[in-house]
């Protein structure tokens, strides 16, 4: 099986129909990623098969169990090289996607990817979640907030949850320590207005990686004091 077939089968395993145009977009995305990675640090993974599995399929796995659907508004917080937001957008082309990152160089990269791939309804925010989570144009405006960052779960919650509408979802892609992080997040869940829904185990082809998706529903408005000022959530997480 070649790499594009591996990607195709993986996407279809998440109950998403593929076509040649979609698969070509993923191929080009990876090429742009590798090219830009020469001048800035976007990823430690460049090999085609590894990018397809560990970045693209891992990102797309966020659709499992139906919390993300076409037509929804999504904000990807701390998106970095565009994960999971851009792979989700390629697969579900009527998503309204907002990509937020604190580094302008990464925003420039994301704008270039979106331009080349002709992705519509993508908004770019250069800034910190702590600042934009207070902005009434963005606060509690999204059906879903996603994160695939390395920060601890209570920190990610404070970054992401203020963006989510009541009734919407916070979906966090995590590694093997998801259960431990969940235990450490009970106070943040209560304070920020969340209800824990489920942990979804993700199996990716040809890699021995234990990935999990944590799903939370927003059941009440987030208190106005959150998010706290830039730097505070990381220095003093809600615990």
Predicted regions and their residues:
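SAM/dcSAM-binding transferase cores
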Residues: 183-239
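Residue-level signal for inorganic ion chemistry
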Residues: 33, 88, 174, 216
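Conserved SAM/SAH cofactor-binding pocket of Class I
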Residues: 60-151, 157
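Helix-to-beta-strand junctions that scaffold the AdoMet/dcAdoMet cofactor pocket
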Residues: 92, 164-166
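Conserved beta-strand signature within the Rossmann-like core of class I S-adenosyl-L-methionine
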Residues: 167-177
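Short alpha-helix immediately C-terminal to the canonical SAM-binding loop
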Residues: 106-108, 178, 182
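Short "lid" loop at the C-terminus of a central beta-strand within the Rossmann-like core
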Residues: 130, 152, 175-179, 204
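Class I SAM-dependent transferase core
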Residues: 2-71, 75, 108-122
């Amino acid at each position: 099986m070649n790499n594009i077939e591996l990607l195709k089968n993986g996407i279809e395993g998440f109950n998403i129909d593929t076509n040649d145009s979609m698969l070509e977009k993923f191929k080009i995305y990876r090429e742009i990623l590798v090219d830009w990675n020469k001048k800035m640090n976007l990823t430690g993974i460049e090999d085609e098969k590894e990018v397809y599995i560990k970045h693209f399929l891992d990102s797309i796995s966020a659709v499992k169990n139906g919390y993300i659907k076409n037509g929804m508004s999504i904000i990807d917080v701390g998106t970095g090289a565009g994960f999971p937001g851009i792979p989700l957008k390629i697969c579900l082309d009527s998503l309204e996607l907002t990509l937020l990152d604190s580094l302008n160089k990464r925003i420039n990269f994301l704008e270039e990817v979106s331009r080349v791939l002709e992705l519509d309804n993508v908004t770019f925010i250069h800034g910190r979640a702590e600042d934009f989570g207070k902005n009434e144009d963005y606060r509690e405006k999204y059906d879903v907030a996603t994160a695939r960052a390395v920060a601890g779960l209570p920190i990610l919650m404070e970054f992401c949850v203020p963006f989510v509408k009541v009734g919407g979802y916070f979906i966090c892609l995590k590694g093997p320590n998801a259960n431990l992080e969940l235990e450490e997040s009970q106070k943040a869940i209560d304070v920020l207005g969340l209800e824990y829904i489920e942990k979804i185990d993700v199996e990716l082809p040809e890699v021995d990686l234990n990935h999990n998706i944590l799903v939370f529903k927003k059941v009440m408005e987030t208190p106005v004091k959150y998010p706290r000022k830039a730097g505070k959530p990381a220095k003093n997480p809600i615990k």
